[in-house]
């Protein structure tokens, strides 16, 4: 597979994000914050699970778009909550959120790299979906009790 093809497939994640931005108002009204987190987590689990099981790259293309859409369902809920953590220090709260996001991405790349060497791609991709649904359900439970 060429790097151009890989880049085009990965661009689908951004396309999913754009789709989310076009539908966010309707989604928030219908699902609420807890629903966004829960549905986003379920879609992430299904998407990563399907990618882990996929045997042909063409199947992965719509799944990557779906991952972009569902990632932003979860991420946007977390980000919105970050702005409400400390209203008197909103800038600091959002900065802390961004710091944690980028630190998590850096640590995730290192951790996943080692995990792939030990376990292979498919189990690690599947476990990513499991970790994300756990995060989504934890957040959803916190939103329900807030």
Language model features with spans:
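Multi-pass alpha-helical transporter architecture, strongest
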Residues: 129-146
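A late C-terminal transmembrane helix in Major Facilitator Superfamily
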Residues: 84-119, 128
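Intracellular helix-loop hinge segments at the cytoplasmic ends of transmembrane helices
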Residues: 72, 76-85, 98
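Helix-to-loop junctions at the C-terminal end of transmembrane segments
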Residues: 19-33, 116-117
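Short hydrophobic/small-residue motifs within alpha-helical transmembrane segments
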Residues: 11-15, 102-103
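C-terminal transmembrane helical hairpin of 12-TM major facilitator-type secondary transporters
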Residues: 34-78
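Membrane-helix boundary and inter-helical linker elements of multi-pass secondary transporters
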Residues: 29-30, 52-53, 84, 116-122
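Juxtamembrane helix-start elements in MFS-like secondary transporters
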Residues: 2-10, 60, 90-94
């Amino acid at each position: 597979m060429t790097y151009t093809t890989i880049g085009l497939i990965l661009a689908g994640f951004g396309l999913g994000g754009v789709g989310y931005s076009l539908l966010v108002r309707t989604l928030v009204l219908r699902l609420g914050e807890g629903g966004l987190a829960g549905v986003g987590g379920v879609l992430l689990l299904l998407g990563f699970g399907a990618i882990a099981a996929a045997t042909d790259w063409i199947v992965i293309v719509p799944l990557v778009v779906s991952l972009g859409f569902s990632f932003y369902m979860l991420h946007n809920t977390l980000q919105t909550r970050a702005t409400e953590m400390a209203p008197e220090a909103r800038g600091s709260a959002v900065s802390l959120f961004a710091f944690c996001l980028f630190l998590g991405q850096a640590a995730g790349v290192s951790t996943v790299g080692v995990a792939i060497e030990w376990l292979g791609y498919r189990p690690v991709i599947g476990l990513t979906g499991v970790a994300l649904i756990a995060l989504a359900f934890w957040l959803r439970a916190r939103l329900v009790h807030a």
